[in-house]
């Protein structure tokens, strides 16, 4: 009996380990995104590189969310629309991270397309 209780307690304690937040690598703040977007119009090619890197990261992040959730919320959505949405989101939320924007955009796209979360 006590072995069974110990086993159940171990399972319950271990489940808390899996409930922890995941650290995201490469996520930038919205304030940094706005700054990079301003530099994107520069005549110096090197000034445009950070925005290109962040765009690639964000599209990868969204694609990863779509794959992980098995919800094809990106279907029919073009990159320009995604970046316009992100520009508006980041102007309104400069202290948030792009990962938070990705979560909100995914939720909004699923709602618009009638996809259950």
Protein language model regions, located:
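Short N-proximal segments of mature Sec-exported proteins
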Residues: 20-88
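Sec-dependent signal peptide recognition
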Residues: 2-10
